[in-house]
């Protein structure tokens, strides 16, 4: 393992230069991998719009809110379908007409597991606005994760998406924190299970991991441009069969396809000897 780590660090600067000069890639991107507290990457300290990756730090804030207020995952809120955005990605819209009671567990599963934008905004409404999420990130010690906008606000003005931003390096550090705290309480354990069962982005980092590995992750996708490209992100925890883990984050600004995320992640794994 020590030899692998040393080799990875030696080739990092050469790999980074090659990545910068890679004219075959259409996307501007930042990516990094953390293993054994060591981070290597390219543009890992640059800011990128999180898009729906934002729903991960939001979920951590929701867990803190529920815990502090003595509330359970099975507590409910009544949702009126007429109050929800109708022209956004929202699987929950197909579940009901009129009014329906949703548990916080259901809203977290919709937001994290299916990236439902209405579910995310309901969590903002009942468990703390964007500024509460950012404040919680600061409390945990993460200063390069910024949350200022709801999904509805970004939907109205897509250029505002950058106001929910992070650096790839800070996101892997937050995921590392989560890895070590996932069993602290039932809320975090539920978030872990939900992200492990995530149904989005299967052609992104999941397509690049070793066949025997598992992933706990959250994806994000921006608004498509007239040219047919869009920001695509993925960040997650890779669980290796030997019991070890690695944290990976890939953020792009105008990716032509999900396969680009897998390609970048595959390079990271190869440099770290995970393939």
Walk through the language-model features, giving the residues of each:
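Structured C-terminal helix/loop/strand segments within mature extracytoplasmic catalytic/sensor domains
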Residues: 18-26, 39, 125-126, 130-131, ...
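Mid-domain, small-residue-enriched loop/turn segments at the edges of structured enzyme/sensor domains
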Residues: 28, 121-182
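Conserved catalytic neighborhood of penicillin-recognizing serine enzymes
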Residues: 84-122
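Acidic/histidine-rich, surface-exposed loop or edge segments in extracytoplasmic proteins
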Residues: 35-43, 89, 114, 246-249
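Short, conserved catalytic-motif segment at the N-terminal edge
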Residues: 25-47
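Active-site SXXK
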Residues: 49-77, 111, 248
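Short, well-structured active-site flanking segments
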Residues: 64-84, 130, 184-188
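Bacterial Sec-dependent N-terminal signal peptides
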Residues: 1-18
């Amino acid at each position: 393992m020590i030899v692998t780590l040393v080799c990875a660090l030696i080739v990092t600067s050469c790999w980074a230069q090659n990545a910068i000069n890679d004219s075959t890639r259409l996307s501007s991107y930042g990516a990094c991998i953390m293993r054994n507290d060591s981070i290597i990457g390219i543009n890992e300290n640059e800011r990128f719009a999180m898009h729906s990756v934002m729903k991960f730090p939001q979920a951590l804030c929701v867990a803190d809110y529920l815990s502090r207020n003595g509330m359970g995952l099975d507590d409910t809120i009544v949702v009126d379908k007429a109050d929800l955005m109708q022209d956004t990605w929202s699987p929950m819209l197909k579940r009901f007409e009129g009014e329906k009671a949703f548990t916080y567990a259901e809203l977290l599963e919709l937001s994290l597991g299916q990236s439902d934008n209405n579910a995310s905004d309901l969590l903002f409404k009942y468990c703390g606005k964007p500024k509460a999420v950012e404040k919680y990130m600061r409390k945990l010690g993460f200063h390069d994760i910024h949350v200022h906008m709801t999904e509805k606000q970004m939907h109205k003005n897509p250029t505002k998406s950058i106001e929910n931003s992070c650096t790839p390096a800070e996101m892997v550090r937050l995921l590392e924190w989560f890895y070590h705290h996932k069993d602290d309480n039932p809320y975090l354990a539920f978030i872990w299970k939900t992200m492990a069962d995530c149904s989005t982005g299967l052609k992104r980092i999941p397509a690049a991991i070793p066949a025997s590995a598992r992933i706990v992750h959250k994806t994000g996708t921006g608004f498509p441009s007239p040219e047919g490209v869009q920001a695509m992100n993925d960040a997650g925890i890779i669980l290796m069969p030997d019991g070890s883990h690695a944290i990976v984050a890939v953020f792009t600004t105008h990716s032509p396809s999900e396969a680009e995320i897998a390609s970048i992640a595959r390079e990271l794994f190869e440099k770290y000897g995970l393939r």
